[in-house]
């Protein structure tokens, strides 16, 4: 039982960190584009990340835990990385490429977390799977802007 609780909390925390990365990245990139269709897709994705993040927070609290989220250093590294990669090129194509790569990394993180925490409850596993499927779908949608 304790092993399941730990796996639940760890898997849900992985979802929190993954969704925070997506949400924070999109919040930084949205103001950089004037492409109306691209911006609409980014806002849609940001809203889904926010929703999944809230669900993971609620589930962690229901398990008696407290979500940690991304560390300040991880947030800073991401922010600086985006700033460097967009310093000279804020084109839709460049932004879409960066986000496509990020979505791919998010999918890999979801797969690893699900394998690392096999004893998590079905609800936690479903949430992680929904995040993974959303990121796979997002990657495909972003490819149209390359």
Briefly describe each language-model feature range:
Residues 1-146:
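Amphipathic alpha-helical hairpins
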């Amino acid at each position: 039982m304790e092993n399941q609780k730990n796996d639940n909390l760890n898997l849900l925390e992985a979802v929190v960190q993954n969704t925070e990365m997506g949400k924070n990245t999109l919040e930084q990139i949205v103001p950089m584009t004037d492409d109306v269709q691209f911006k609409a897709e980014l806002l849609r994705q940001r809203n889904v990340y926010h929703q999944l993040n809230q669900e993971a927070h609620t589930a962690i609290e229901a398990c008696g835990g407290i979500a940690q989220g991304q560390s300040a250093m991880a947030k800073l590294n991401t922010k600086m990385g985006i700033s460097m990669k967009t310093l000279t090129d804020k084109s839709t194509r460049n932004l879409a490429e960066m986000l496509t790569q990020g979505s791919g990394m998010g999918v890999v993180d979801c797969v690893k977390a699900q394998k690392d925490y096999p004893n998590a409850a079905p609800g936690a596993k479903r949430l992680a799977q929904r995040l993974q499927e959303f990121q796979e779908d997002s990657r495909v949608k972003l490819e149209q802007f390359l």
